[in-house]
Amino acid sequence: MFINREIAQLILLQRNELTNPSLQKIRKIFGRRFFTKFVSKYLISPKSIGNEYLSLMKDEYEIISKFLDFDKKNVLSIGSGLCGLELIIDRNHSIKKFSIIEKNYVSKKVVYGWDNKNYEAYNKLSLVESFLINNGLKKEKFEIFDFDSKKLPDKDFDIIISLYSLDYHYDFDVYLDFFKKVFKKNSKIIFDTIRADYFTNLFDSVKIISSNENTVHKSKRIICEGIKL
């Protein structure tokens, strides 16, 4: 896997569970800003982080691929970070195209938790593009959209993926009007939430495929189909 130090830094911001115990202790003592500006810049092993990240994405793929058929599908990814999962999907399926919606900045003080309006961000879209291309995803197979540019995809999607992002860190309603434009009759969306029952009001079908009781959120991963307009 191609990964440089800048990309490894992004991975640690997006998936902080990959930070080793020693570095976690440093972050706890000196704070996130010091950790982001200095520790993650000089005291990390990009290769090791890349391998752990790839392993994590493979695990995620194994879970969702049991419930979703990606072949010949248009896939929308929201809040997917570096998009390692999309790489794994592409290696195992014949995808039509990925559309990726992400933010293009790193918050000055990264805060993890709930954010109603989706203001928090920790990404750099030029690095996402570099990561995908250098790891074998052809440029014509994906398009990246900056959430804050207000220019979002205007086509229908078969599958929408938003793991540990939509309704996990910010309100689902941020995207609701947009979804009503891009959902087809048989479109499916997969995401993590603590309020699975709520979505029976928005979709014809809501299926819980896994539960994560080991996190603060105690979230459930659900697949929804048939948006109610």
Kindly label every feature range from the protein language model.
Residues L82-I95, V111-Y112:
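Conserved SAM-binding loop of SAM-dependent methyltransferases across substrates and taxa
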Residues N186-R195:
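Conserved beta-strand signature within the Rossmann-like core of class I S-adenosyl-L-methionine
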